[in-house]
């Protein structure tokens, strides 16, 4: 009886934990993640090389890195990770990391144009949405321009 080789996994929602990415997150995060992960070491950042090593150890071949937009800009506790942070990881490790562009329904058409730019010029393959961070159901009209743009671009939206 022969055994098949292991099937490599794809992490479909992976955060980017570089020092640069963590600098964009709010101050409450360390307390929030305490006890859930190795917060003392991970909250200082994980290099992309270390992230790839951890992925290899877990049998993960590829990861979808998302650039979260969590809550309206300027509200306490909210944060937006610039697409450029994820784009640099995609450029450095093509074929290992793929990008998902976070959506903020309150950005309107400027957000739609930023999504299009991320897909057409930064190598992103889809969009990511946290509906609960915006207190809007996924079928709210504020999302329609983003949905239409994703259809036009032929990319999926991941809702979490």
What do these predicted ranges mean?
Residues 1-68, 73-77:
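An N-terminally biased module of ancient metal coordination in phosphate/nucleic-acid-related enzymes
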């Amino acid at each position: 009886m022969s055994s098949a080789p292991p099937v490599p996994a794809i992490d479909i929602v992976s955060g980017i934990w570089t020092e640069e990415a963590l600098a964009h997150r709010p101050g409450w995060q360390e307390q929030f993640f305490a006890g859930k992960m190795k917060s003392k070491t991970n909250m200082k950042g994980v290099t992309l090389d270390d992230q790839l090593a951890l992925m290899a150890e877990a049998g993960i071949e590829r990861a979808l890195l998302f650039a979260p937009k969590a809550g309206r800009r300027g509200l306490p506790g909210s944060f937006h990770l610039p697409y450029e942070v994820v784009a640099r990881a995609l450029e450095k490790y093509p074929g290992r990391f793929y990008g998902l562009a976070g959506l903020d329904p309150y950005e309107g058409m400027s957000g739609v144009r930023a999504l299009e730019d991320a897909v057409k010029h930064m190598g992103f393959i889809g969009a990511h949405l946290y509906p609960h961070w915006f207190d809007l159901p996924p079928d709210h009209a504020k999302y329609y321009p983003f949905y239409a743009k994703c259809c036009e671009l032929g990319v999926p939206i991941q809702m979490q």
